[in-house]
Amino acid sequence: MGNIHIQTKSKEYDVHVGKEVLSNLTTIVQNMQPAVSNVMIISDEAVASLHLQTVIDALQVEQHVFSFVVPSGEKEKSFENFYAAHTSALENKLDRNSLILALGGGMIGDLAGFVAASFMRGIRFVQVPTTLLAHDSAVGGKVAINHPLGKNMIGAFHQPEAVVYHTPFLQSLPEKEWRSGYAEVIKHALIGDVELYHWLKEEVQTLADLHDEKLIHILTKAIPVKANVVSQDETEKGVRAHLNFGHTLGHALEKELGYGNITHGDGVAVGMLFAIFLSEQVYKVDLAYEDMKQWFLKYGYPKMPGDLNVERIVQLMKQDKKANAGAIHMVLMQEYGVVNVVSISDETVHIALEAFQKDMV
């Protein structure tokens, strides 16, 4: 078990990581000032069926505790569910001293966090992640819902009071979700902890290695990379954009293929490979792209689909939040551990994407 301290301009809080940290929830809630009036747990059907009662039992508090459960899947991070959650909150008499508890993966963390950010102009919430992917999204305060024209386009910055990362919850994950979350671990290693990157290559030969002490080690190394960036740039005006390494193409693939048809991590993995492919050309450096490609494929990450229309993907990349004045801005790598946001012309991206697509066949 280990605590990771997060410090931003707006709030300080701890990430509790370990096999027995769920019991910390009671103390966290009881110690909040002003006192918590009641607790709303937001979850999805898959997670609720496995873990909702466990969390309710762990919450040994006097306050009224109720739940709001949505269907599972990224497409459920919608305005309709956001609105329905507000309705449930009002019907159950949530007030400004209430607490929302986000029980689930990144989708639930984003949805519940945005409900908390907007209900009565902002109430407190706690993240209880149940996926490896959420080691990224649960920390840092970015909360949002999707719009049909783009992912995470409606949202806010709203820091949690705490993050309780009870690792036994992750054991029920299917392989594709382990792979999806591991992509963000790789991202954090590549942009901010080269020592972790080398450790991963040695110690994580298959996704089956992501358990017990190795899992806790990974979380306690990857989360501080995110924490360090967020402490410098809470609202993504500068270096926080570095955390979007691999996401410009990744989000475009999610949008083109349809949310739920490719996991976020699979999209980011393809996006990171493309970013390395393009970085070698832009910076005239050797980043061992071929070795990286084989390493990714070993874990089962997909290739860039050969039947996608490249020009369509370029246009979707221009809808990315980093885009400025209609120009694509990507996070590129000068060397392992050193990344920058770079403006890239449509033509350069198009040519590189075509070459990348052919290389991945």
UniProtKB/Swiss-Prot annotation:
- Positions with a binding annotation for NAD(+): 72-77, 130-131, 142, 151
InterPro entries cross-referenced by the UniProt entry? Dehydroquinate_synthase, DHQ_synth_AroB, DHQ_synth_fam, DHQS/DOIS_N, DHQS_C
Cystine pairings recorded for this chain: none
Q: Where in the cell is it found?
A: Cytoplasm
User: What does the record give as the reaction this protein catalyses?
Assistant: 7-phospho-2-dehydro-3-deoxy-D-arabino-heptonate = 3-dehydroquinate + phosphate
Q: Please state what class of enzyme this protein is.
A: lyase
Lineage, top-rank taxon, reads: Bacteria
Please state the protein's primary subcellular location.
cytoplasm
Enzyme Commission identifier(s): 4.2.3.4
- Quote the record's cofactor note: Binds 1 divalent metal cation per subunit. Can use either Co(2+) or Zn(2+).
* Pathway the protein takes part in: Metabolic intermediate biosynthesis; chorismate biosynthesis; chorismate from D-erythrose 4-phosphate and phosphoenolpyruvate: step 2/7
Which cofactor(s) are needed, names only? NAD(+); Co(2+); Zn(2+)
Q: Which UniProt keywords apply?
A: Amino-acid biosynthesis, Aromatic amino acid biosynthesis, Cobalt, Cytoplasm, Lyase, Metal-binding, NAD, Nucleotide-binding, Zinc
Please list the GO biological process terms of this entry: amino acid biosynthetic process; aromatic amino acid family biosynthetic process; chorismate biosynthetic process
Output a single Gene Ontology CC term carried by this record.
Answer: cytoplasm
Kindly list the positions annotated as binding Zn(2+).
Answer: 184, 247, 264
Q: Which GO terms describe its molecular function?
A: 3-dehydroquinate synthase activity; metal ion binding; nucleotide binding
What family name appears in the similarity comment? Belongs to the sugar phosphate cyclases superfamily. Dehydroquinate synthase family.
Q: What does this protein do?
A: Catalyzes the conversion of 3-deoxy-D-arabino-heptulosonate 7-phosphate (DAHP) to dehydroquinate (DHQ).
Query: Which PANTHER family has this protein been placed in?
Result: 3-DEHYDROQUINATE SYNTHASE (PTHR43622), 3-DEHYDROQUINATE SYNTHASE, CHLOROPLASTIC (PTHR43622:SF7)
What's the protein called, per UniProt? 3-dehydroquinate synthase
Q: Which organism is it from?
A: Bacillus cereus (strain ATCC 14579 / DSM 31 / CCUG 7414 / JCM 2152 / NBRC 15305 / NCIMB 9373 / NCTC 2599 / NRRL B-3711)
